[in-house]
């Protein structure tokens, strides 16, 4: 599955194993950009890194699709779509090369993820989790129609416990003519 941008050389497609190393680099750089980790706190090395094995496992997973944005042969973004029970999918691992931010690439990746959730998994709803303390990030997703469910998920880590806000969005189903 490939999505072409209206202008430029940007292409969004399902990642394969040839993209693994570039994706690992992108995700690590996106997570650690500007001295901040994905948690909004100073990064610890392990938190700002993802292993090549983890990337390869995501690419090979049966019930998920790792999408990659490529511009002129360079990986500039990614998003993970995972099939969940009950006609739902989850959006995760949204990352954009720090030099390509504020150009609408995140919006394109979200749109591609939504289309993939519908076309590949038949989902009628998509959800994501945002760190509860990251209000700006929750506001970003709200601009795309995601709304808080009121549900929070807690993830215990070695040094802290992280609390996530669950947000969902209904997906438009194509109307048969």
Language model features with spans:
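Conserved GNAT-fold acetyl-CoA-binding loop/helix
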Residues: 28-55
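A conserved beta-turn-beta hairpin within the catalytic core of GNAT-like acetyltransferases
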Residues: 83-94, 101, 120-124
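Conserved acyl-CoA
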Residues: 108-125
């Amino acid at each position: 599955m490939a999505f072409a941008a209206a202008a430029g050389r940007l292409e969004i497609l399902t990642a394969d194993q040839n993209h693994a190393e570039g994706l690992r680099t992108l995700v690590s750089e996106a997570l650690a950009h500007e001295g901040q980790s994905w948690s909004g706190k100073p990064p610890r090395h392990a938190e700002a890194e993802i292993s090549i094995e983890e990337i390869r496992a995501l690419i090979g997973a049966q019930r998920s699709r790792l999408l990659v944005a490529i511009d002129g042969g360079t990986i500039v973004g990614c998003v993970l779509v995972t099939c969940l029970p009950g006609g739902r999918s989850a959006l995760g691992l949204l990352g954009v090369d720090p030099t390509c931010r504020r150009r609408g690439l995140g919006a394109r990746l979200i749109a591609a993820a939504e289309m993939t959730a519908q076309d590949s998994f038949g989902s009628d709803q998509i959800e994501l989790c945002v760190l509860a303390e990251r209000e700006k990030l929750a506001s970003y997703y709200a601009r795309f129609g995601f709304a808080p469910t009121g549900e929070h998920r807690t993830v215990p880590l070695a040094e802290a416990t992280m609390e996530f806000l669950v947000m969902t969005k209904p997906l438009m189903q194509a109307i048969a003519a």
